[in-house]
Amino acid sequence: MTTNDAPTNDADRWQYPTLAKPESDSFYSYHIQRRISTWFSVRLAGRMGANAATGLDLIFGVAAAVLVLLDHWLWGVVMIQLFGIFSCVDGEIARIQGRSSRIGDFLDTLTDRVVELLLVGAIAFSLRDRMEDPAALTAGFALLGGVFLLTTSSEKFRSAWQMGYPKRRLEKLFGLFCSGSDSRLLMLSIGLAVSDLTGDGLFLLWLLWALAAAAYVNFLVRIGLVYRHFRAGDPTKS
């Protein structure tokens, strides 16, 4: 099957939420981003492959980080949201075309991780320059540590149980603001917009600290949830 032969003619078949991932999508991704991304995916699936969409997603993400670093925060927010939408589009195109692949999943995951790293770093450095306060860097690195723990635990769960971590079902509260990259980037987008419009970087600084603290608590809770819900029937082994 070529890209142009992809089964996109039956538009009703691919209406929201057919292409969503209800177990692993966070609230924001499932209810907002997927509604928009499905519209793009149905129209692009006959014109590009999933890996090309991942490449476009990477461009949006890097552009967002550069804009934030150059102090264009509102434009950065726009690009962050485009990045979030196209983070859904690549996988949706793969499902529409019936061409899901391990390499595609690998590239998609790497793109998400790299872009979030760049964005948090760009926010921390840009905020430091605006406020002339090194605490912004400390808060940014604290958040990156929490992000590392959450993403590593998700990927290890997927490798151990051969399925995505069901954060939407098990972490409904954390899913609103920190358990997934989409919700974290939404919170950071709100922080960027509010701080840029008010001219007060203190809101964004405290948001970085709050997200960092929430991420560490989320990680500890996740350990308990995995132990509680998935330990049964697991043979004892090192």
Cite the ranges covered by each PLM segment:
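C-terminal membrane-associated helical module and adjoining short loops/tails
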Residues: 1-36, 149, 153-238
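Short, amphipathic, aromatic/basic-enriched membrane-interface segments that mark the entry/exit
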Residues: 40-53, 106-111, 169-178
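Core segments of transmembrane alpha-helices
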Residues: 56-63, 112-123, 175-194
